[in-house]
From Swiss-Prot:
Protein name in UniProt: Ketosamine-3-kinase
Catalytic residue list: D217 (proton acceptor)
GO biological process: post-translational protein modification
Single GO MF annotation: kinase activity
A Pfam family that the UniProt record links to this protein: Fructosamin_kin
Lineage summary: Eukaryota, Metazoa, Chordata, Craniata, Vertebrata
E.C. no: 2.7.1.172, 2.7.1.-
Domain notes: The ATP-binding domain is structurally related to aminoglycoside phosphotransferase family.
Sorted UniProt keywords: ATP-binding, Kinase, Nucleotide-binding, Phosphoprotein, Transferase
Residues recorded with modification Phosphoserine: S20
Amino acid sequence: MEELLRRELGCSSVRATGHSGGGCISQGRSYDTDQGRVFVKVNPKAEARRMFEGEMASLTAILKTNTVKVPKPIKVLDAPGGGSVLVMEHMDMRHLSSHAAKLGAQLADLHLDNKKLGEMRLKEAGTVGRGGGQEERPFVARFGFDVVTCCGYLPQVNDWQEDWVVFYARQRIQPQMDMVEKESGDREALQLWSALQLKIPDLFRDLEIIPALLHGDLWGGNVAEDSSGPVIFDPASFYGHSEYELAIAGMFGGFSSSFYSAYHGKIPKAPGFEKRLQLYQLFHYLNHWNHFGSGYRGSSLNIMRNLVK
């Protein structure tokens, strides 16, 4: 690994440090180089490059908003012996505690960033001879992302769609249900999904949804803080409904009331929020079912039963 990093990063010295870590999907280790300390994530799977390229694109997109801190990605490389590695900036992080409210506010800023870009473009359209100079980020009017991103190790279909309800049903829930059908042929799950599809449009009546750049997998294990404030990492980004972000945040804990107060101070709950939150949690329960097995079947079916009532 040291030789690979020396060659690919153009470093003269690379040395492994004592810092290592890992999650459910990949392992990581820090290295000291003459250009600074880097963190290297390693995954041996054949499809790891696609996963890491999606993560790199996600981190890059979040960085450009200048809203919430993420590690700066450096390069995706083929790993010696198979799989891939993602090299990124090393950050000294600790458990999120004193900066929860700041994270709530900054996450709302991330979700509002594209909306503000759109408002700015509209204003500029009526202004003659405005000064250029800085690179312009375009307003994103559709739902999706330029590359495949992975929530866990399963790829997400990010093809661009005009309509959020169509995007969410076809490109988030349907692929998960297809996997459930292929693996277990669970008839009850499939029948509930057929019934739920007819109900979904009712949950979005009279709701205007402007595409928001999402982290995409914001549970307590993917947030931390350093001396300057909150940090988020391991994203699976796409442009979607801001409410989607809060689904997995509420499933496994790790976020205090101050986080939610700060967030909703900037993005208030719209009518029907609680039911839509269940619909968004359904994706994550199905995704866990497909990753880790039928221990998540009961939660998946309960949500569908509640929503088809």
